[in-house]
Amino acid sequence: MINKIIFGYLILVTLVIADDYTSQRGMTNLLGVETNLRCSQQMSNPKAKTYELSYKRTASMPLSPFAGEYKPKFLPEIPWAGSRQVFTMDVLNENVNDGNQGTQMDALGHFGYTDEIWDGDGDADLSSLKYFGKLNGKEVKPTPESPLKKLGIESVPPIITTAVFLDVRKHIFNGKAMKAGEYVTVQHIEDTIKKSNVKDRGILPGDVVLINTGWSDNYQDPDDLGIYYTKAPGVSYNLVKYLSDKQVVGVGLDTWGVDTFAEEGEYGPERSQNPEGIANPAHHYFLTQSGVHTLENFNLKDLAKDSVDLSCVIILPLMTQGSSASPLRPVAIGVPTT
C-alpha cells in the first residue's frame, strides 16, 4: 500500500509541470513511470535512510573562480581562450554567482561551441555558435545581455530517479583520493560495478550516476587552504561517451567541474582522447551533444561510508527563467549496506 501511495505521488510530481519543454530536453525526457517506480522501491524500503548530497552554503565555503553578482544580470556569451567553446552565465549578487556556487547543476544552455578556435585575442566570432539540438546562438541567447531564451534551467524537470553510486576511490584506488589530472575511465567504472552491489543491475536508462573520486577531501569550510577549486580529477572523454550511450540523465562527481583540471604535466594519458579545440570535453559532450546534465560539488561522503550503491535521488533545480545553472539541495534515499 505504501509503495502505491509513493508511486502515485511521484507520478503527480512528474506530471505537474506548467510548460512543455520536451523539445529543449535531452535525457530527462526518459523520466517517467518507469523511473518513478524504481524510485518508489528504494523509498518504501523500511531500512532506507535519507542522505544529504549538498554542502552547506556559507560565506566561507570554497568559492568558484567564476563568482559574480547576485542580482539578476545576464552576461554576454563568454568564449574560452584557446578553444572553440563558448559558455553562458548569469550573475546575481556582487561576488556571488549563486547558480555556479556550492552544490549545483548546469542547464543544457550553459555551454555552446563554435566552428573555429578563438585564440583569446580580440572579439570571438560567434556567428557559428551552436548549442544542444543544433540550436544557434541567436535562438538561445538573442543578445549579449539577454537571459537564455531556450535551454535555460527552467526547462529541466524535477529529477526523481534511481542513482547509481560508483565509489572508484574505494574499489579502484584502494581508498586513496584521486589526484588532480587523473581520469576516471570506462574500465574503472566497469570494474567498480563488478565489485559493487549493482553488479547484476548495472546502469539503466534514466539513471543518475554519482562518482566518488575522493577529491572532496579538499573541500574545507572555512576554505583556509584554497586547494579545492585550483584543480581536480575528472571523467575521461571515452567515459563521457560511454555514460551518454547508457542514456543517463545526469553525472555528478565530488568535484567542482566534472572535467579534469591540472597543471601541464599532471594530466593522465586519457587527455589524448579529448577532441581538438574543446577545453572542457565533459561539459561539451554532455551538455551540447547528448543532453546529460552535469552535477557539481556533490557531497558523497555519507553514501561512501554506508556503501549506498543504489538509491532514489531527488534533484530539484530552481525555476530561474533564463539561467544557465541552479543551486541544489539534492537528497538520496537508499539502504545502507555496511
For each feature predicted by the language model, list its residue ranges:
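A positional/structural detector of protein chain ends, strongest at the extreme C-terminus
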Residues: 1-3, 338
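Cleavable N-terminal signal peptides of Sec/SRP-targeted secreted and luminal proteins
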Residues: 3-18
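Active-/binding-site microenvironments in catalytic and ligand-binding cores
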Residues: 17-338
